[in-house]
């Protein structure tokens, strides 16, 4: 028997890589689902900044479309989020995003299925579905690939949003 105190090993303080990446994946996906695009697009950029590595690579189903680096991916994300935010906040677009985990068995790799429903004020709906594969390094995404993309419904048009002319205010007269 030893008189030296026993301390937990570092392995007890930090879960195994499989658990660590699964926990990070759940946190990232919950943050995405809970964010509200009609309120702010900046919330999504904050999530991206928190969870993605500086050297992240994002791709679609074809390898030629790989986008390297956080700055380039952030710009692409911004070009998607700003118009979506304007359509939701000003145009009355209803936006709902859902995620379902897909079981995996490799440490540092996660899979999920996504659904984005866009509903215009006209009632017209466009649904986008895709799957995501992520590689993690600790709590940071270092690679993300989107695949199995599907679109249901037709793209929404200007007529499906409420950007129409504003009714004149009663009692307000234009200057002559």
Language model: regions and residue ranges:
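C-terminal and inter-domain tail/linker signature
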Residues: 2-176
């Amino acid at each position: 028997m030893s008189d030296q105190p026993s301390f937990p090993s570092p392995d007890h303080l930090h879960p195994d890589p499989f658990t660590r990446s699964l926990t990070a994946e759940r946190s990232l996906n919950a943050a995405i689902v809970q964010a509200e695009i009609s309120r702010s697009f900046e919330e999504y950029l904050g999530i991206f900044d928190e969870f993605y590595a500086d050297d992240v690579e994002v791709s679609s189903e074809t390898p030629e479309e790989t986008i390297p680096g956080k700055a380039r991916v952030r710009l692409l994300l911004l070009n998607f989020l700003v118009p979506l935010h304007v359509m939701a906040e000003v145009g009355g677009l209803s936006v709902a995003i859902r995620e379902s985990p897909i079981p995996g068995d490799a440490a540092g790799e996660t899979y999920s299925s996504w659904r984005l429903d866009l509903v215009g004020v006209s009632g017209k709906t466009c649904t986008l579905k895709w799957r995501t594969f992520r590689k993690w390094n600790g709590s940071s995404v270092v690679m993300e690939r989107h695949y199995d993309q599907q679109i249901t419904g037709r793209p929404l048009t200007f007529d499906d949003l409420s950007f129409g002319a504003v009714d004149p205010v009663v009692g307000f007269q234009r200057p002559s």
